[in-house]
């Protein structure tokens, strides 16, 4: 049985308040977003900047990754602000 169809609170029959349920959903969404962000940064920045993986990053690779992550985060912030101000 998956987590969406399992009874709340371990199947004891007690109900979960809407507030507790909402906090749980928010936490799960935040975790999923963080995992997706890390994967996106890996594919967009690491794969772009590190052409020959080794035991450590070179100076140019490190600065390339830093710039890439910075640009991606800035673009994400601009898009988020734009979406939330349109509502």
UniProtKB/Swiss-Prot annotation:
One of its GO terms (biological process) is protein transport. SUPFAM superfamilies: Tim10-like. Pfam families: zf-Tim10_DDP. Residues 1-20 are annotated as: Disordered. InterPro entries: Tim10-like, Tim10-like_dom_sf. Its main location: mitochondrion. Keywords: Chaperone, Disulfide bond, Metal-binding, Mitochondrion, Protein transport, Translocation, Transport, Zinc. It is found in: Mitochondrion intermembrane space. Disulfide bonds join 45-68, 49-64. A motif (Twin CX3C motif) lies at residues 45-68. Expressed in roots, flowers, young cotyledons and leaves. GO terms for cellular component: cytosol; mitochondrial intermembrane space; mitochondrion; nucleus. The keyword Protein transport applies. Heterohexamer; composed of 3 copies of TIM8 and 3 copies of TIM13, named soluble 70 kDa complex. Associates with the TIM22 complex, whose core is composed of TIM22. The twin CX3C motif contains 4 conserved Cys residues that form 2 disulfide bonds in the mitochondrial intermembrane space. However, during the transit of TIM13 from cytoplasm into mitochondrion, the Cys residues probably coordinate zinc, thereby preventing folding and allowing its transfer across mitochondrial outer membrane. Belongs to the small Tim family. Mitochondrial intermembrane chaperone that participates in the import and insertion of some multi-pass transmembrane proteins into the mitochondrial inner membrane. Also required for the transfer of beta-barrel precursors from the TOM complex to the sorting and assembly machinery (SAM complex) of the outer membrane. Acts as a chaperone-like protein that protects the hydrophobic precursors from aggregation and guide them through the mitochondrial intermembrane space. This is Mitochondrial import inner membrane translocase subunit TIM13. It comes from Arabidopsis thaliana (Mouse-ear cress). The lineage of its organism: Eukaryota, Viridiplantae, Streptophyta, Embryophyta, Tracheophyta.
